[in-house]
Each structure stands twice: as structure tokens, then as C-alpha cells.
Design a protein with these regions (language model features):
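Active-site core of glycosidic bond-cleaving carbohydrate-active enzymes
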Residues: 16-52, 83-100, 104, 108, ...
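Extracytoplasmic, non-cytosolic globular domains
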Residues: 90, 111-115, 119-120
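Acidic/histidine-rich catalytic neighborhood
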Residues: 116, 120-174
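Flexible loop/turn segments at secondary-structure boundaries
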Residues: 6-9, 100, 142-146, 275-276
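Beta-strand segments within the central parallel beta-sheet cores of soluble alpha/beta enzyme folds
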Residues: 38-42, 55, 107-115, 133-139
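Glycine- and aromatic-rich loop/turn segments at beta-sheet edges
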Residues: 1-9, 51-66, 123-140, 197-207, ...
Length: 278
């Protein structure tokens, strides 16, 4: 899918895999899982290339890249190669199709892809021995103003990692397979969302302590809201702090530097904290 939909030719029509969630995750929710299911066949065709990418980079499983050609070969990008928020989408989308259909054939069709996607996610996370936790680093966040060389534990990615691995474990249970102990360890020790010094706001990432005063961090996607807007509540976050964070975003954000999907993301986050009229 394109990043800006069907009416504007962004990036010369290049393929942006993270946009499939925005373009098609809604279909199963209003009675048309078959439309999403039809598209998900691409992941089967792309799996050999995605597996080679993960292997070349020293990871397990399969890595879904942000920007590729239609056959999943990487397209050159100084940003796209560092993004990871598209990685759990296959798990999320397959789960939505299964929930809508309750068809065991869906589990069988996507089970191997779900497992290999989760294997990459586990191997990509880094164990921080000094603090006995798992972290996400060396990435550009969905809020692309955060630099890969500095970025540590961006909030939306943390939530997506927790959701993706939790759901992969649920698929194992549905298929009569035991849970993977190492995945459960990661889920228990995955870093929570980073907070400001007063503990009242969530940061753009753990290193971005000036998240609401530095123009770089109040521009682009307010991706911190995606941690709850796109993914369900988890032990990683607190709704009251997220509500405070939404209020702060409304107060200080550089709205001229936002994108179309930022607004539904904030709206869904507001609904989940009990403030749908925001």
C-alpha cells in the first residue's frame, strides 16, 4: 500500500508495508475479513525473502521490511531500513481475521508465519543485564524524528512487541502447542513506557527527556498515542498517564508537521482512556 492512500502519489507510489494496518485492519471489524485475508496472501509469497533478510542480519525468523518492491526485496531508504513497527502487523491482522471468522483454517494458514514473525521479534529485542529487562534499540521509531543512534524504547514499538508476542503465544495455545518459555520471559521483563521526571507523562522514547520542549520531538507522528490507540492495554502503560499525555500533545504539538493517520490514532487512544469526545 501507499503511505497516503489512493488519491496522492507519495514517494512515487513506493510500497510501504507499515501502511497495510491503516488501509485494511478495519475490514474484519465490519464483516469483511475476506478482503483482508485476500491481501495477506502476499506474506506467504514474501516469506522466503523476509527470511533471508533476517538471516543476513543475524536474527531468527523472518523480518518484514518497511519499504520493498512487490516481491519483498528491499528498497533503498535511510529511514525505512531502521523501522520495526510493521513487524507485528502480520500477527495483528491474522488475529483480526481469526476473531471475525473463528475458522481453524485461518490458524493453520498463518500459523507458521505468525511463529516466524514472533521468532524475529524475540531475537531482535536486547536483554539489558544491568537492569534485568528487555529493550528495543538501534531503530527509528514510528515518530521518525527520533534518531536510530540514540533511540531507546519508543512507546508504540514496545506496545506492539508486547501485543505481537502475547498473541503468538495465544496462537500456540489454540494449536495445542506449549508456550515458548523465552517469550514469556521477554513479556514479563519488557521495558514499560518511559515517563518524565514527575511520572506524569509518557516520553517519545526513553532517551528523549525533553519530549515536550524540543521541537524535533513534538513534530511528526505523535506515536506515543499509538501505544494504546493501536494496541490494547497492557502492563506496560497506565491509562491516567496516557490521558495526561494526550492533553500535553494537544497543548504543544507542531500540527503542521503531522500526517493523515495521526488523527485517528489519537482518537482511538482517547477512546481507550475513556475520553472519546476529545
Amino acid at each position: 500500500p501507499q503511505e497516503t492512500g489512493l488519491t496522492y502519489n507519495s514517494w512515487f507510489g513506493k510500497f510501504h508495508l507499515e501502511m497495510i494496518w491503516w488501509h485494511q485492519s478495519h475490514f474484519p471489524l465490519w464483516g469483511h475479513p475476506e478482503l483482508l485475508n485476500r491481501t495477506l496472501g502476499w506474506y506467504h509469497r514474501a516469506e522466503p525473502v523476509a527470511r533471508q533478510i533476517a538471516e543476513r542480519q543475524g536474527f531468527d525468523g523472518i523480518r518484514w521490511m518497511k519499504m520493498t518492491d512487490p516481491d519483498a526485496m528491499e528498497a533503498p531508504s535511510k529511514v525505512g531500513s531502521f523501522l520495526i513497527w510493521q513487524q507485528p502487523h502480520l500477527i495483528h491482522l491474522a488475529e483480526l481475521v481469526y476473531r471475525a471468522t473463528k475458522d481453524e483454517a485461518v490458524l493453520k494458514n498463518y500459523y507458521d508465519l505468525v511463529m516466524k514473525t514472533a521468532e524475529f521479534m524475540y531475537s531482535f529485542a536486547t536483554y539489558d543485564e544491568a537492569n534485568d529487562r528487555y529493550i528495543l534499540k538501534g531503530i527509528i521509531a514510528a515518530q521518525e524524528t527520533l534518531r536510530a543512534s540514540e533511540n531507546l524504547n519508543p512507546p508504540m514499538e514496545l506496545s506492539s512487541w508486547h501485543y505481537g508476542l502475547s498473541t503468538a503465544q495465544l496462537w500456540r495455545e489454540r494449536m495445542g502447542e506449549p508456550r515458548v518459555a523465552e517469550w514469556d520471559t521477554l513479556l514479563a521483563k519488557l521495558s514499560p513506557l518511559a515517563k518524565d521526571a514527575e511520572g506524569k507523562l509518557y516520553l517519545a522514547s526513553e532517551d528523549a527527556t525533553d519530549s515536550y520542549t524540543n521541537k524535533r520531538f513534538i513534530s511528526d507522528h505523535p506515536a506515543v498515542t499509538g501505544a494504546l490507540g493501536m494496541y490494547p492495554e497492557s502492563r506496560l502503560l497506565d491509562k491516567e498517564i496516557m490521558n495526561n499525555t494526550i492533553d500535553k500533545i494537544f497543548e504543544v504539538w507542531n500540527w503542521d508537521e503531522t500526517w493523515g493517520w495521526d488523527y485517528p490514532m489519537i482518537a482511538m487512544c482517547a477512546a481507550r482512556v475513556g475520553e472519546p469526545d476529545k
